[in-house]
Amino acid sequence: MFISMWAQDKNGLIGKDGLLPWRLPNDMRFFREHTMDKILVMGRKTYEGMGKLSLPYRHIIVLTTQKDFKVEKNAEVLHSIDELLAYAKDIPEDIYVSGGSRIFQALLPETKIIWRTLIDAEFEGDTFIGEIDFTSFELVEEHEGIVNQENQYPHRFQKWQKMSKVV
C-alpha cells in the first residue's frame, strides 16, 4: 500500500531547492514517527536535496531516469513508476511517498492514505503539490499542531483515506 506524506503552505508550496522552505519541528517529528523503519520512495531531486542526511533507519527508493545514479547504503534506485509498482507487489510493507510533486501525482491512483500537513503561512519556493483530486478520499482525522517558540506557524495534520468503491 502506498501512503503519501507531505507538508504544504497556503499556496500548495512543498519545496525549495529540494528541501522544505520552512522550519517546523512538529512536522518533522510527525514525519519521522510515521516513516521510521519503513520504506520511503522519493524522486532524485528530493533525495539530492537531503544531501548526506539520507534519512537513517529507513530504506529509501530513489526514482530517477539516470541509469548511473549513486545512492547511500540504505537506498536503491528504480527507474520508473512501473518498476516501482512491480517492486511493491512483492513486499507486504507499506511504502511511504515523500515527493516530489510528480511522484505524488503519478502514484495518486495507487495511494490509499494521504497524510498532509497544512501550514497557515506563505513561503518562497519552486515546487508545488499541484492539483490533488480528493474526491475519492475521505478526511478521517484532523488535529491542530501546537504553536510555540520552536513551531511558529499555525498548522494542522490531516489524514485522508481512499474510500472503498461501492459496487
UniProtKB/Swiss-Prot annotation:
GO molecular function list: dihydrofolate reductase activity; NADP binding
GO cellular component: cytosol
Positions annotated to bind NADP(+): 7, 13-19, 45-46, 64-65, 99-106
E.C. code: 1.5.1.3
Domain DHFR: 1-162
InterPro entries: DHFR, DHFR-like_dom_sf, DHFR_CS, DHFR_dom
Keyword NADP applies: yes
Enzyme class: oxidoreductase
Recorded catalytic activity of this chain's protein: (6S)-5,6,7,8-tetrahydrofolate + NADP(+) = 7,8-dihydrofolate + NADPH + H(+)
Top-level taxonomic group: Bacteria
GO biological process, one term: dihydrofolate metabolic process
Metabolic or biological pathway, per its Swiss-Prot or TrEMBL entry: Cofactor biosynthesis; tetrahydrofolate biosynthesis; 5,6,7,8-tetrahydrofolate from 7,8-dihydrofolate: step 1/1
Residues binding substrate, per UniProt: D27, R58, T117
Membrane-spanning segments: none
UniProt-listed Gene3D superfamilies: Dihydrofolate Reductase, subunit A
Pfam families xref list: DHFR_1 (PF00186)
Keywords: NADP, One-carbon metabolism, Oxidoreductase
PANTHER family for the chain: DIHYDROFOLATE REDUCTASE
Function: Key enzyme in folate metabolism. Catalyzes an essential reaction for de novo glycine and purine synthesis, and for DNA precursor synthesis.
Family: Belongs to the dihydrofolate reductase family.
Protein's UniProt name: Dihydrofolate reductase
Gene from which the chain derives: folA
